[in-house]
Amino acid sequence: CLVGSEMCIRDRANTAVSLANFNVDTRYVTKLPKHTIGQSAVNSLRQYGVDVSRIVRGGDQIGIYFLEKKTSQRPTNVIYNRNGSAFALATKEDFDWDSIFDGATWFHFSGITPAISDNMAEITIEACKEAKKRGITVSCDLNYRSKLWSSEKANKVMSEVCRYVDICIANEDDAVGIFGMDASKSDKEKNAYIAEE
């Protein structure tokens, strides 16, 4: 959660806010409803110095998730409520890549983005292609979430996405969940596997 904010923002927004705190120019791209809750999300980002001028407005719902904290022997549980959100229902036509990438040198996204919906998977691939066409560095934090998509679907989509990624951030769970990598292999074997893929 962002310090001093009642709204909890995760994933790419935290990356943008963290960079803005180090005086790095950041721009956040998403689609949010044009109502009070959507505006609150925009304002929350803006207050930290994040450029929100490319946020697309439309749709009715904002995607959310609930975090049930661990108690006693019950593990932490995340409940996603993102189906039907403005972001999940976004289309390729919503995003003007010339405007979005104008002056950009780096494009970062989370692996949660293409997991949100088939539309977002297609849009993520298109965004990566458009960034690469412009010579922009592309980075991805895989963030595999089995509650959002199967390993098979994640593998299919992320294998395509990663063709355009310069820097891929992952932990062993991400590598196993998305690419089926055997985390018990030696570093030499892992590196050879990654290079082959």
Task: Place the predicted regions along the sequence by residue.
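Structural alpha-helical scaffold elements that stabilize or flank donor/cofactor-binding regions
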Residues: 1, 99-100, 160-161
